[in-house]
């Protein structure tokens, strides 16, 4: 009788150890992928804000870099053009507003660059652990912005 109970306990403990190892690997990989994606987007924003140059090659490189780390992410690059308007309340004064623009390849000084990253779907290991044990991490969802300097 004791041998049977010990075998059951041994199988349960082995199963728990394997699951904990998979959970640890998933969390470690996810966190490393998130840090790498944030670093890529930060480098992209810094480069564009410093040089005010963006072409299709830069955009393709950003898409490829963000997709290379594991999580399937959607990258949106938004441009807000700086507009100086006369102030109707005080003649002679002006105020600034920002208007969304579809043209992301031509930049002026003072324009805002906004890069939004959202996760489209989980990785295979993450979906397995969620379906079996309910372990889940918050999806990748962040936005970085910068103002064009030159």
Give the positions of each predicted feature.
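Alpha-helical assembly-interface signal, strongest on the long, hydrophobic N-terminal helix that forms
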Residues: 2-63
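Short, conserved structural patches
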Residues: 53-150
């Amino acid at each position: 009788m004791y041998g049977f109970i010990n075998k059951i306990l041994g199988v349960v403990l082995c199963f728990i150890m394997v699951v904990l190892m998979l959970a640890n690997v998933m969390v470690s990989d996810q966190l490393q992928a998130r840090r790498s994606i944030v670093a890529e987007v930060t480098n992209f924003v810094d480069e564009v804000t410093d040089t005010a140059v963006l072409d299709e090659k830069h955009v393709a490189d950003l898409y490829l870099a963000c997709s290379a780390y594991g999580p399937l992410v959607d990258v949106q690059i938004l441009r807000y053009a700086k507009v100086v308007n006369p102030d109707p309340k005080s003649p002679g004064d002006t105020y600034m507003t920002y208007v969304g623009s579809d043209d992301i390849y031509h930049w002026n000084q003072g324009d805002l660059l906004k890069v939004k990253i959202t996760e489209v779907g989980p990785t295979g290991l993450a979906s397995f652990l969620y379906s079996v044990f309910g372990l889940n991490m918050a999806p990748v969802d962040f936005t970085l912005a910068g103002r064009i300097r030159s």
